[in-house]
Design a protein with these regions (language model features):
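Conserved donor-binding/catalytic core segment of Leloir-type glycosyltransferases
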Residues: 195-221
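Aromatic "clamp/platform" in nucleotide-sugar-dependent glycosyltransferases that forms part
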Residues: 260, 279
Length: 386
């Protein structure tokens, strides 16, 4: 089996899509599956090893962290003709994904898509709600011809089904429980950041409107004084609202910037509660990372995160976009530290059952089934030629 993957976001960009695809390519290498990956080139001096095929790109004006690819269709077509893929996976619906779609449709090749981001909800945060109907019209066109559309959670699958999408399949997400583990809890984290408060609250993610970061900021500012003295916040990440949030944050908030690998895993394990207000997630990778690290999770009952957290067992779920709801739960946590530990333990047990290996092997089986079904579909068309 030979696969061609198309994505408009990849490393060194840090987001759920790029990290998932990086893990997928690693798994394909382990399984000996030939593949190419077409992705944006972040800088002219960057070098890329096989199987990555970098495409010239420029910063996206609305979100400079993201890249807008400027693909050469002729060059991509030459690469694909030489490679002869059995299936194309279009991970994003933008310029690079469109190149894959054009090639697949032109040659009648098996192709699948994956839905990673609720862009319709993002548009509302950037005062572009009026174009949501146009967005859905485009998305339905993009996904219409594919042999399967993969969604990362049942919540996302249901929302796509409600929009009329067909041939939907679940492609969930896994977690590296050796990297993210409670064993990495370290007092050095508190020493490094000068933390003396008994309860360490953690947020990991982009500092951006679509993450409902204003809810987090208001909860930080409006916690009662008696509670403020007992908690410290670590905010891990970067984004367009970071400067504004720094100015508004109380003194018990530390901003670390982006963290990766072992350093990030240590931050997770050394916190006491993961606080995540985003209502726009299709899955919520950081929530699963927190659970694997033995952290209880305080999040909202909207988006893919609600499929991960069981209230009272692995964390707490509150109404979205409500700073008061977050404040109430954080205040209650102060009195019941043992309950937090118990929920963190149960979250760890859930995460242990979600290995990337089993999830990617399931995806590969889906690929193989789609390729085989496509071959059978061609038989009736070829019979008159026999």
């Amino acid at each position: 089996m030979r696969l061609a993957l198309f994505t408009d976001t990849f490393l060194p960009q840090t987001n759920g899509v790029s990290l998932t695809l990086q893990r997928l390519t690693t798994h394909l290498n382990r399984r000996g599956i030939e593949h190419l990956l077409f992705s944006p080139k972040s800088a002219p001096e960057d070098s890329y090893a096989d199987p990555i095929r970098p495409i010239t790109s420029i910063p996206f004006f609305l979100y400079p962290e993201c890249r807008l690819a400027l693909p050469n269709m002729s060059s991509i077509q030459s690469e694909l003709t030489a490679f002869r893929p059995d299936l194309l996976h279009l991970a994003t619906p933008f310029n690079i994904g469109l190149c894959g779609l054009r090639y697949a449709r032109k040659l009648g090749l098996p192709h699948v898509t994956s839905y990673h981001t609720h862009f319709d909800r993002y548009l509302e945060y950037y005062r572009m709600k009026k174009i949501v109907p146009l967005y859905w019209k485009y998305m339905k066109w993009f996904h219409r011809s594919c042999d399967a559309t993969f969604a990362p959670s049942y919540e996302t699958l249901d929302s796509l089904q409600a929009q009329g999408f067909q041939r939907l399949k679940l492609w969930s997400r896994g977690i590296d429980c050796n990297l993210y583990t409670p064993k990495k809890r370290s007092h050095q984290v508190r020493e490094r950041y000068g933390i003396t408060a008994p309860l360490l609250l953690l947020y990991v993610g982009r500092i951006a409107p679509e993450k409902d970061i204003n809810v987090l900021a208001l909860a930080m500012q409006q916690l009662p004084e008696s509670i403020q003295a007992q908690v410290h916040w670590l905010v891990v990440g970067d984004g367009p609202l970071l400067s504004e949030m720094r100015v508004q944050a109380p003194q018990n908030v530390t901003f670390t910037g982006y963290k990766h690998g072992e350093e990030l895993a240590q931050l997770y394990a050394s916190a006491d509660l993961f606080v995540f207000p985003s209502s726009t997630e299709t899955f919520g990778n950081v929530v699963l990372e927190a659970m694997a690290s033995g952290l209880p999770v305080l999040t909202v009952n909207e988006g893919g995160v609600k499929d991960l957290v069981t209230p009272g067992r692995t964390g707490m779920i509150v109404a979205p976009r409500s700073p008061d709801a977050f404040i109430r739960e954080i205040s209650a946590c102060i009195a019941y530290p043992q309950k937090l530990a118990a929920m963190g333990h149960e979250g760890r047990q859930l995460a242990l059952g979600r290995s990337w290996e089993s999830i990617f092997d399931g995806l590969i089986r889906d690929y193989e089934e789609i390729i085989e079904n496509k071959r059978f579909d061609l038989i009736p068309a070829l019979l008159p030629l026999v």
